[in-house]
Amino acid sequence: MYLYNSATHKKAEFLTHTPGRVEMYTCGPTVYHFAHIGNLRSYIMEDVLEKALRYEGYDVNRVMNITDVGHLSSDADTGEDKMVKGAKREHKTVMEIAQYYTDAFFADCKKLNIKRPDVVQPATGCIDEYIKIIEKLMDTGYAYFAGGNVYFDTSRLDHYYVFNDHDEDDLAVGVREGVDEDTNKRNKNDFVLWFTKSKFENQALKWDSPWGVGYPGWHIECSGISMKYNGEYLDLHCGGVDNAFPHHTNEIAQSESYLGHAWCPQWFHVHHLNTSTGKMSKSKGEFLTVSLLEEKGYDPLIYRFFCLQSHYRKALVFTWENLDNAKIAYDKLIARIAALNPENGSVDEASMSVLKEKFQKALDADLNTSLAITTLYDVLKADMNDATKLALLDNFDQVLGLALLSHAEAKRKEAAKTTSASTASGYQITGEGDPEIDALVLKRYEAKKAKNFAEADKIRDDLKAQGIEVADVRGGAVWKRI
């Protein structure tokens, strides 16, 4: 597999420290609010990457943190702890907020068919690990105590900016939140490893440390958790591109200074989900959730399909029209799969090889999910029996996670019910094999039969808005997409 490496700005063959095993780390959510669908784009693509690695035979140990302390409203170690901010907003304790939004996050992940990582570790559970790392950094001169806090000294590094393609507004992290500069820092880019009560008197969560009662900085949490569960050598670090600087930059600085050797060679960054007003952001108060998509009638897997249609290193523009187009494409795909007969032939493994190779090449080409999706249509057009097509689609869906066969089976059952009801009424529906549309056409007929013409006209207009044209014929109706 060849992946783009954000640290080298090149595509290269993905290699691991231990052959056949991948130590993978994912920056998890700060659980002070619901995850928005921009956040979840990153987790969808990281999920596909993990599944692709497993598909290729790797033993993957994927670790994710849950940030429940220490992430301030500015990435420059200023502002209020986001967890405290969330607790105040909802008049609850920090731990109540953390548990509620952690549960909500994983509920969203389940709906999006995102596999739960092998290890999920709240930041508050590894305080001893952070203190151990900070003590060594102090002893070796990489950290200093000032104003009641412990800072990492970036001037000790030969090279600090690892990801030099970050945005200018990311460099001005202390400015963009409208907060005061931290005057205790020796250098502009120094960052806090440990806060004490001298920083925030109202901090809810505090622990004893050699430097006084306090709490860890955001960046040290990921290093400590990864070293505990992934070991000294991390193969693959994932996250949103907005975390490249300063968060991932600081992780590298403190981890390699502590370990005395290179830490993680491969960095996988997923780009932004943008709206008409720019990057989706909780801090701006403008964000969409999975629950909102569901309220508007979208299966969350439509959003997953939407994400997979674009490459992870390209900014993805979200509009309702774009999501509608993804829904139409997904529904058509499911309808075509539903039309396959699982009893038509037996699975022919030999005939799968060419398309399996094409699918594999798409994954190996920097996780080209849009190309991988085209292989689904190649399967449907291939000269092979239906049983083999279904087996191949199921094989590819181990990576894509689109629930293709289960959704197709549900559509078959729905179609059977509609056909049964249509037959019982003597009404013949001819269309493109979409049971949801068939059901609406039948409902329109029943409304007309009951002389509820307003309801019948409303259904016709709703179908037309979806691009469906219905023509009444003797003994039934014919519908088509226009």
PLM regions and their residue ranges:
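Short, glycine/charge-rich beta-strand/loop segments that flank catalytic centers
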Residues: 63-70, 98-105, 115-130, 148-157
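Non-catalytic interaction-recognition regions
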Residues: 92-96, 106-132, 142, 244, ...
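Structural preference for alpha-helix termini/caps and helix-kink/transition segments
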Residues: 279-281, 287-482
